[in-house]
Swiss-Prot record:
Principal localisation: membrane
Compartments in which it is found: Cell inner membrane
Subunit structure: F-type ATPases have 2 components, F(1) - the catalytic core - and F(0) - the membrane proton channel. F(1) has five subunits: alpha(3), beta(3), gamma(1), delta(1), epsilon(1). F(0) has three main subunits: a(1), b(2) and c(10-14). The alpha and beta chains form an alternating ring which encloses part of the gamma chain. F(1) is attached to F(0) by a central stalk formed by the gamma and epsilon chains, while a peripheral stalk is formed by the delta and b chains.
Other information: Dicyclohexylcarbodiimide (DCDD) binding to the active glutamate residue inhibits ATPase in vitro.
UniProt membrane topology term: Multi-pass membrane protein
Name the UniProt record assigns to this protein: ATP synthase subunit c
The keyword Cell inner membrane belongs to this UniProt entry's keyword annotation: yes
Gene Ontology molecular function, alphabetical: lipid binding; proton-transporting ATP synthase activity, rotational mechanism
Length: 105
Protein backbone atom coordinates (compact mmCIF):
# COMPACT_ATOMS: atom_id res chain seq x y z
CA UNK A 1 0.00 0.00 0.00
CA UNK A 2 2.86 2.36 0.75
CA UNK A 3 4.29 1.66 -2.70
CA UNK A 4 1.00 2.65 -4.36
CA UNK A 5 0.81 5.86 -2.37
CA UNK A 6 4.38 6.71 -3.32
CA UNK A 7 3.67 5.85 -6.95
CA UNK A 8 0.64 8.16 -7.10
CA UNK A 9 2.60 10.95 -5.44
CA UNK A 10 5.29 10.50 -8.09
CA UNK A 11 2.64 10.90 -10.79
CA UNK A 12 1.73 14.34 -9.46
CA UNK A 13 5.19 15.60 -10.40
CA UNK A 14 4.75 14.28 -13.93
CA UNK A 15 1.37 16.00 -14.23
CA UNK A 16 2.88 19.39 -13.30
CA UNK A 17 6.15 19.03 -15.27
CA UNK A 18 5.29 21.39 -18.10
CA UNK A 19 6.18 25.04 -18.66
CA UNK A 20 2.56 26.27 -18.57
CA UNK A 21 1.61 29.90 -18.44
CA UNK A 22 -2.08 29.86 -17.58
CA UNK A 23 -1.67 29.70 -13.81
CA UNK A 24 -4.58 28.05 -12.02
CA UNK A 25 -6.13 26.64 -15.17
CA UNK A 26 -3.15 24.36 -15.70
CA UNK A 27 -3.50 23.02 -12.16
CA UNK A 28 -7.18 22.27 -12.71
CA UNK A 29 -6.42 20.52 -16.01
CA UNK A 30 -3.58 18.54 -14.41
CA UNK A 31 -5.73 17.43 -11.49
CA UNK A 32 -8.52 16.49 -13.91
CA UNK A 33 -6.14 14.29 -15.89
CA UNK A 34 -4.66 12.77 -12.73
CA UNK A 35 -8.12 12.05 -11.29
CA UNK A 36 -9.24 10.50 -14.57
CA UNK A 37 -6.16 8.27 -14.67
CA UNK A 38 -6.58 7.10 -11.10
CA UNK A 39 -10.33 6.54 -11.48
CA UNK A 40 -9.93 4.59 -14.69
CA UNK A 41 -7.13 2.52 -13.17
CA UNK A 42 -9.26 1.61 -10.17
CA UNK A 43 -12.23 0.74 -12.39
CA UNK A 44 -10.09 -1.43 -14.68
CA UNK A 45 -8.49 -3.17 -11.69
CA UNK A 46 -11.87 -3.86 -10.09
CA UNK A 47 -13.33 -5.03 -13.38
CA UNK A 48 -10.44 -7.42 -13.92
CA UNK A 49 -10.89 -8.90 -10.45
CA UNK A 50 -14.64 -9.25 -11.02
CA UNK A 51 -14.15 -10.92 -14.39
CA UNK A 52 -11.60 -13.31 -12.93
CA UNK A 53 -13.95 -14.27 -10.10
CA UNK A 54 -16.85 -14.77 -12.53
CA UNK A 55 -14.76 -16.98 -14.80
CA UNK A 56 -13.43 -19.00 -11.85
CA UNK A 57 -16.94 -19.54 -10.49
CA UNK A 58 -18.19 -20.60 -13.92
CA UNK A 59 -15.35 -23.07 -14.38
CA UNK A 60 -15.93 -24.48 -10.89
CA UNK A 61 -19.67 -24.82 -11.52
CA UNK A 62 -19.10 -26.52 -14.86
CA UNK A 63 -16.59 -28.93 -13.29
CA UNK A 64 -19.07 -29.88 -10.57
CA UNK A 65 -22.06 -30.25 -12.88
CA UNK A 66 -21.16 -30.44 -16.59
CA UNK A 67 -24.83 -30.56 -17.60
CA UNK A 68 -25.41 -26.90 -16.78
CA UNK A 69 -22.22 -25.68 -18.48
CA UNK A 70 -24.04 -23.94 -21.34
CA UNK A 71 -26.41 -22.14 -18.99
CA UNK A 72 -23.54 -21.04 -16.76
CA UNK A 73 -21.57 -19.81 -19.76
CA UNK A 74 -24.48 -17.65 -20.92
CA UNK A 75 -24.88 -16.19 -17.45
CA UNK A 76 -21.15 -15.54 -17.24
CA UNK A 77 -21.18 -13.63 -20.54
CA UNK A 78 -24.03 -11.43 -19.28
CA UNK A 79 -22.11 -10.77 -16.06
CA UNK A 80 -18.93 -9.97 -18.02
CA UNK A 81 -20.86 -7.48 -20.17
CA UNK A 82 -22.22 -5.75 -17.06
CA UNK A 83 -18.76 -5.59 -15.48
CA UNK A 84 -17.23 -4.20 -18.66
CA UNK A 85 -20.04 -1.64 -18.94
CA UNK A 86 -19.01 -0.18 -15.58
CA UNK A 87 -15.45 0.27 -16.82
CA UNK A 88 -16.72 1.92 -20.01
CA UNK A 89 -18.91 4.28 -17.94
CA UNK A 90 -15.80 5.27 -15.99
CA UNK A 91 -13.93 5.87 -19.25
CA UNK A 92 -16.73 8.13 -20.52
CA UNK A 93 -16.76 10.03 -17.23
CA UNK A 94 -12.98 10.45 -17.38
CA UNK A 95 -13.15 11.80 -20.94
CA UNK A 96 -15.89 14.23 -19.91
CA UNK A 97 -13.87 15.35 -16.88
CA UNK A 98 -10.84 16.05 -19.06
CA UNK A 99 -12.37 17.67 -22.15
CA UNK A 100 -15.50 19.44 -20.91
CA UNK A 101 -14.50 20.45 -17.41
CA UNK A 102 -16.79 23.30 -16.26
CA UNK A 103 -13.97 24.84 -14.19
CA UNK A 104 -11.84 25.45 -17.29
CA UNK A 105 -14.28 27.63 -19.23
Amino acid sequence: MKFLALFFLALVGVAFAHDGGMGGMDMIKSYSILGAMIGLGIAAFGGAIGMGNAAAATITGTARNPGVGGKLLTTMFVAMAMIEAQVIYTLVFAIIAIYSNPFLS
